[in-house]
Amino acid sequence: MPDGSMYPSGNVSTMRLTGYADLFGVNPGKNIKFYVNCNGPSKYNVQIMKMINGDTNPRGPGLIETPIEAACNGNYSGRRQVINSGSYGYVADKPHFHLESFTMQCWIWPTTPKTHPKYWRHGAQGLMGRWSNDKGYGLFINEQGCLEMRINGETLTTGAPIRDHAWHFVAASYDAATGKATLYHEPQIQYALDPTIEPVEKTISKGIVNEANVPFTVACYTATTDGGALAKSSVPSGIVMRGHFNGKIDSPRLCRAALSRQDIETMKMGANRSMTERRNCGPTGDLAKVVVGSWDFSDGINTITGKDKGPYLYDLDIVNCPTRAMTGYNFTGHNFDWKHAQEE
């Protein structure tokens, strides 16, 4: 139990000391481990008790317990322990992700794109990129539920809310030579009264700052890389992810050049070697030269790996087991067993 003096004044409603054992019970002479979380107190006290009556009903005898002498009794130092929830994919930092120019693209099916102060307070959601603390590049859904590109501390947004539970094709490109950033948001289904979402452009003169040790992420963004104590349980260890995307992502692509809209359309086919008679890893010879990653989530559905069909085979390490074998943007409705139509 924690020392009562270590509670903040007037704030005793929160459980500051929690924990669990690795076993439900042991025989005499066996070992049992306890994992303790101290959210506030710096120390806690351990005392083995003999429970005689644990029923606190006022009609009964109440709680009755007596202390038992044990070598483990005493005071221990404690610290806060965290559980890093949320699923995502990442590739550890590689030189190929240190880009000057880029094009990112993917299909998204958001569940809750907009932050609601009373219901859903998730903040911005990361889609893909290599961005952390106003450095790097990334594609996001911002707090207003609109598509947003980030280059260092600069942002570019369409200003058009993303419809939930629907597929959207999104893409972002940046040309370091001209500073031109372009953002595309194209709903798969365009209803009669829907406004047309035009591509938006912005000139960003300062180039991308590529920090070391920042992984490339899908469905989140990197919050910290300081390797602090609270980050040890994160994956990868020492790096904390935030802004987990709530929804489905399909066919993410990354190229190290600012592609035209026509080339972006061609890249939807991914690293399709059959288009060039298997002479390279792109849908065309020119695009094969700039492909960094082309991930295919239909391959290895029963694994915790996101397969990269690009030239470098940068498979995503998938964390916390996101739901897989979901219907994709190209689902025809003819098959309901994913094993018969994995590409859908």
Predicted segments — roles?
Residues 44-50:
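Beta-strand-rich binding/interaction modules
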Residues 1-16:
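Proline/serine/threonine-rich low-complexity linkers at boundaries of modular beta-sandwich domains
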Residues 53-59:
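Surface-exposed turn/loop modules enriched in turn-prone residues
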